[in-house]
Every structure is written in structure tokens, then in C-alpha cells.
Amino acid sequence: MIEVDGLTFHYPDGTAVFEGFSWRVAPGEAWAVLGPSGCGKTTLLYLIAGLRLPLQGEIRVGGDRILRPRPQTGLILQEYGLLPWATVRENVALGLRIRGFYGPDGTHAPAGEAVTARREITQAWLDRLGLSHVAGSFPGQISGGQRQRTAIARTLSLQPDLLLMDEPFASLDAPTREDLQNLTLQLRAETGLTTVVVTHTIEEAALLGA
């Protein structure tokens, strides 16, 4: 699924992050990337997602060389990335609306995707993530756990085949964090997603990277 060959990447100040790094992730596998702050964990996710490009070497996902963001790759961040002026429902539907403009490959407008179908998909994920009762609320009106559930629903509504998660539960309280960790395991079992999770805790790495 993920093939990293001879990856070299430096920060703008010249600091070397990766030098000739190679890695393989098979379809359906779950990996946890563990390490201290500043060691390049998030940078690795951004490189796999196509948000940054290597100085040398190449990254392939699903057999395709990554030269730009890949529509089938889902990325969930610690900061949620929600639009504060949009409701929970609108935030969950955002990816589907963008796909309606640019198409599944991110470059070609589709022949047509029924608005009704998008609404049904959005509602299904609101139900699955337990968000239906706050669907009309804004991000500032709901809890951190609900905001992260919204981000997860928005990403998974697009049916990605690769899910990248950058310390998604680090800012949550312990009960909410455990709840969302278990939810992630359930969703992975249901979908067979290939998953890479960045974390700074050994316990979370052991749980989500197994």
C-alpha cells in the first residue's frame, strides 16, 4: 500500500529529517509512528499525503507515485480542521461537496453525483459517529470529542483506502481519548483501512498500531 524508497527530506533551515529512509506498509496494516516532538513524525505523514515533496527518493501509495495530494488518502489532524462558521452537518458534508466540484480523482469534474446521495452519506456518518443530535450545532458549541468525531466522519465519508492520523486524540481528556481510540479500532475492523497513526505515547502506539 505504502512504499517509501530512499526518502531524503530536510527542513528549510537545513536540518536533516530523513536520509535514505525506506519503509513498506501492506494493505490493511495498522502502524503507529512513535517518537519525541520534532523527530519528523508529522512530516512523514505530510510526505505520504503529498502535502510535502521529498528532496530525493520517492513515495508510492497504491502503486502511484505521490507528487500531489491523493484523493483516496484521508488525513485527520489534532486541530480538527473544522470550519467554525459551518454546522457539524455542513462540516461532515464538506469533503463530499468538494468532490462534487473536482471529482473522485481531484482533477476532473464528475458526470454528476446526486445531492440526495450526498445527504444520505452524510446522515449515515452522523448516525454512525453519534453526532445526529448536534448536527445543527457549530464547532464552538460542542465538545472536543465531538469535534474530533466530526473530523473523522468527514474523512471517512469519502471512503479512503488509507487513513493518516496525526496525534488525533492528544488534546482530549482521558475518558474521551479512550472512547475515540476504541471507535478507531471498530471502524478499522469494519472498513479494513490501512492506517498510520502518529503518537507520542507508548500505550496508544501499542493499541492503535497492532
Segment roles from a protein language model:
Residues 1-192, 196-197, 201-202, 208:
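ABC family nucleotide-binding domain
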